[in-house]
Amino acid sequence: MDLQLPRGTRDILPEEVSKWHFLETEFKKVCENYQYEEIRTPVFEHTELFERGVGDSTDIVSKEMYTFQDKGGRSLTLRPEGTASVVRAFVEHKLYGEVSQPIKMYYNEPMFRYERPQGGRQRQFTQMGIEALGSDDPSIDVEVISLAMEFFRKIGLINIKLVINSLGDKESRLKHREALVAHFEPHIDEFCAECQVRLHKNPLRILDCKKDHDNPLIQSAPSILDFLNEESVAYFENVKKYLNALEIPFEIDSTMVRGLDYYNHTTFEIMSVEEGFGAKTTLCGGGRYHGLVREFGGPDTPGMGFGIGVERILLALEKADIKIPAKKPLEVYVITAQPEAELKAVTLVNKLRQNGISAEKDYLKRKFKAQLKDANRKNAVYTIILGEEELQTGNYQLKNMETGEQEAVSETTILEKLINTKGEN
């Protein structure tokens, strides 16, 4: 019997959770400042949702999904990415009928992919992302990109670069597809078995192949930018114009197609350029999709979004030596100098907590010095000492653990004093 963690998963222990809270809080603040509202979707969906939405020619669907049959014989899959579920909810609940458009949502949820575990990549991972549904204006593309860049600025990640591309509209992609087939077909035997299948199914996926990434034929493949029609060129030019207006620097990479089949027009990645973190490590990726809502049974509705892997962001912060703010400090540790003070300690700690002051006491019946050491280990700002004299007089010893200053404060005023002190800080 194996009772240890499954490969590709991890426990987030209490001392680490504050780092996650920091990222979640900052992401929430930025999203809500941009008027995005949170959505929460099920951990598992019908398998067909991802086959149709993500694309059955992608690595995610063909290799990486956790799929199982339930007791009713239904094929279900743990969600491998966030967009398909959000769009499914958008269609199922007819959010496209809302008066206020676009519908702007964010999420922060666990995802599951059967991949080889490595730094910043697990089989269960957490993804933060946004989706804006209902606008085909290029300014919403730039808003989505701007939100991601603002989030990275807020958490201190500045050694990053934005890379963009355009996959054009359907007409542009069909012409590019024909050119790719003509380019690769005479040499298809030089590619992996998967790419040989992709040639006529979805040749764009060959550009994204991990095995054949260094093949010179990929480097010399026809560029999508040479096949953009007039409308697609104008759209991409507007995206670049808005980015320049916001003074967001960017590079263009015509080979960047992303790992999902639903993208069209704008795609982008935000990469770390932090020394020692690995070349072109992607921290955020996203793009525009116009056919997904219709694919799921809704009306033609354009969308734009991105996803960010939390584990990878934490690794990037560590590599950049960025200190995450510590968790909320323990404000008061109540020390009992004798057993008779225990009841008073319980009631005092409870009263402090009810008034918004974090408080703790000893639960192991330790001696006075051991309790004091415990207060130090927990970095308590103050200690309140309850002994025989304090119980008789109702005056408690309040000690500032940083300065060592100690004063007697009456039971009736100690709460007011602590609240006032907290307000000053």
From Swiss-Prot:
Protein's UniProt keywords contain Heme: no
Enzyme class label: ligase
Record SUPFAM superfamilies: Class II aaRS ABD-related, Class II aaRS and biotin synthetases
Keyword flag Transit peptide: no
GO MF annotation, one: catalytic activity, acting on a protein
GO process terms (BP): histidyl-tRNA aminoacylation
Keywords: Aminoacyl-tRNA synthetase, ATP-binding, Cytoplasm, Ligase, Nucleotide-binding, Protein biosynthesis
Major localization class: cytoplasm
Family matches, as InterPro entries: aa-tRNA-synth_II, aa-tRNA-synth_II/BPL/LPL, Anticodon-bd, Anticodon-bd_dom_sf, His-tRNA-ligase, HisRS-like_core, HisRS/HisZ, HisRS_anticodon
GO cellular component term of the entry, any: cytoplasm
Catalysed reactions, semicolon-separated: tRNA(His) + L-histidine + ATP = L-histidyl-tRNA(His) + AMP + diphosphate + H(+)
EC numbers, comma separated: 6.1.1.21
Subcellular location(s) per record: Cytoplasm
Record-linked PANTHER family: HISTIDINE--TRNA LIGASE, MITOCHONDRIAL-RELATED, HISTIDYL-TRNA SYNTHETASE
Family named by the database record: Belongs to the class-II aminoacyl-tRNA synthetase family.
Subunit structure: Homodimer.
Protein name: Histidine--tRNA ligase
Species whose genome carries this gene: Listeria monocytogenes serotype 4b (strain F2365)
This protein's encoding gene: hisS
